[in-house]
């Protein structure tokens, strides 16, 4: 592709996207004490020191996701989200060296057997601990999605780089994206019991969960494309898979993705219009997830000359640097 021209067109689509969702920068800032709490949590799990050192950029990224995307939740909820995210990223990052354990995760889980892998056992313990923070239905959905995610990590470790969907399999790109992104988990994370008890609110927010999940997936696909496929040469991501099944160009797929995202946000706001507080909180989530990508240097969006990115990066560089460095995680 003609890189400079593509960059300009991509940046223009991002500007249109920000306008289309009425993006507003939030006042939330990175809280390093949440990162410290997560680090201490992992120290209690007896992980080797060299592995903890490897985990540090992952924990940093996870704390930024929790604080930027869920600023309306109490601190203990953000800490739980950061712990879960750290484990999810680490499980994917180590999937090629632990494929055997990943494949047997659910078998051991249902047989009530301990996991031989420290990360997998820590994830089981994390799922249990969430039951004091979220309602039973949400915890069931989180456990279900996590089990799928761990299975697909093993799947990708074997088939990564070999699956190329065709026009006869048009639904496969998003099907795979659903499995790899655990977006349903992050949609439900917005509704802890302390804010939205299931007994009173499940029937309201469940209607918005499909679009919130889609927003997480497609939002990451749109905002991570630059670092994946313009700076780097990734050609097997969601955008390129969509191009293959629709016989379109990558730029056309980016355009259609940004339109789908705007529709998601419109649907969410309409669905939650009868619940003003819930809508305000999810608006914070929508804007905060954009801020997460803008503030994390790994996405390299400061290369594009977008005012909103430059303003946020300047603020971050004057305070706490947010750089999630490593990790192949789909968020």
Swiss-Prot record:
UniProt-listed SUPFAM superfamilies: Terpenoid synthases (SSF48576)
A Pfam family matched in the record: TRI5
Domain of life: Eukaryota
Catalytic activity: (2E,6E)-farnesyl diphosphate = (E)-beta-farnesene + diphosphate
GO molecular function (one): carbon-oxygen lyase activity, acting on phosphates
Disulfide bond positions: none
Keyword hit for Kinase: no
Stated family: Belongs to the trichodiene synthase family.
The name this protein goes by in its record: (E)-beta farnesene synthase MBR_03882
């Amino acid at each position: 592709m003609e890189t400079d021209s593509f960059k300009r067109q991509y940046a223009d689509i991002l500007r249109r996207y920000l306008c289309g969702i009425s993006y507003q920068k939030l006042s939330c800032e990175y809280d390093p004490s949440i990162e410290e709490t997560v680090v201490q949590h992992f120290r209690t799990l007896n992980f080797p020191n060299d592995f903890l050192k490897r985990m540090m950029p992952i924990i940093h990224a996870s704390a930024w996701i929790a604080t930027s995307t869920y600023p309306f939740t109490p601190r203990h909820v953000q800490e739980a989200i950061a712990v879960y995210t750290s484990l999810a990223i680490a499980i994917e990052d180590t999937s090629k060296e632990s494929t055997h354990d990943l494949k047997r995760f659910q078998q051991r889980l249902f047989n009530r057997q301990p996991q031989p892998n420290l990360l997998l056992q820590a994830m089981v313990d994390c799922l249990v601990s969430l039951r004091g923070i979220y309602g039973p239905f949400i915890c069931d959905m989180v456990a279900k999605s996590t089990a799928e995610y761990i299975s697909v990590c093993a799947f990708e470790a074997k088939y990564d780089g070999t699956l190329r969907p065709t026009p006869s399999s048009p639904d496969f790109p998003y099907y795979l994206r659903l499995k790899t992104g655990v977006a349903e988990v992050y949609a439900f994370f917005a509704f802890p019991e302390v804010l939205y008890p299931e007994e009173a609110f499940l029937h309201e927010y469940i209607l918005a969960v499909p679009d919130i999940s889609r927003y997480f997936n497609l939002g990451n696909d749109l905002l991570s494309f630059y670092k994946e496929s313009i700076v780097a040469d990734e050609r097997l991501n969601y955008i390129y898979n969509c191009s293959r099944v629709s016989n379109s160009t990558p730029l056309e797929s980016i355009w259609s993705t940004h339109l789908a995202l705007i529709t998601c946000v419109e649907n969410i706001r309409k669905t939650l219009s009868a619940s003003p507080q819930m809508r305000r909180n999810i608006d914070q989530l929508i804007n905060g997830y954009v801020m997460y990508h803008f503030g994390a240097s790994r996405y390299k969006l400061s290369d594009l000359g977008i005012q909103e990115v430059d303003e946020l990066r300047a603020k971050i560089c004057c305070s706490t640097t947010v750089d999630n460095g490593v990790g192949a995680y789909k968020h």
